[in-house]
Amino acid sequence: MSEHTPRAARSDLVADTALALLAERGMRGLTHRAVDETAGLPQGSTSNLARTRQALLELAVRRLADREARVLALEELPDPRGGLDSLVDGLALATHRALTRNRELTLARYELALEATRRPELRAYFDATGARFRDQLTTLVSAMGSTDPARHVLSLVAWADGLMFSCVAGSFGSQAPGLAEVRASLRELLDGMFGR
């Protein structure tokens, strides 16, 4: 990478490399030096962008949120006017992608989430970035007629996180369910949730 790389592009490269290292090596494998070496950057480049470990972790969390927000293309996002089928299709597709083509991001997210339990300053940052997704989901379930949006969002997030953790890091890690299986499970959950 050139010494003259724009700061935003270098920041993305550092954050993407940090996420890849978290997925591959875990929290212990994430160091400023490892990011420099893996990204092919001159030594000290990562430190120039993120002086402290906390700053590097925050950079990774911010990039994770940006990349996860783009898991679905605009035309794939659930449309409340499309009813329950639209919600099921969109959420199932996002969950399936987290298990398959975005598996590395999912692993990195779990590494960061666990680290956030030991670092209050990271917890606050991690929770704030996650609030964007929760707010969007709250809007969707409210539009579907949820009588208790906060509880329903918690149930949906718990279902998705449980499935993703089990299939990425848990005892079901050898094979991710197919999109049809994810969709069927989600449909069962939402049918019960909305009394259909």
Locations of regions flagged by a protein language model:
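Hydrophobic/aromatic-rich alpha-helical bundle segments in the mid-to-C-terminal region
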Residues: 3, 123, 127, 142-196
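Solvent-exposed, amphipathic alpha-helical segments
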Residues: 13, 17-24, 71, 108, ...
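Helix-turn-helix
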Residues: 13, 17-59
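Anionic, Ser/Thr-rich low-complexity intrinsically disordered regions
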Residues: 16, 22-23, 41-45, 75, ...
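Short loop-to-helix capping motifs
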Residues: 52, 115-120
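Short, basic, alpha-helical segments at the C-terminal edge of helix-turn-helix-like DNA-binding modules
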Residues: 62-68
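Amphipathic alpha-helical packing segments from all-alpha helical-bundle domains
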Residues: 69, 100-107, 118-144, 154, ...
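Hydrophobic alpha-helical connector segments
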Residues: 70-106, 153-156, 179
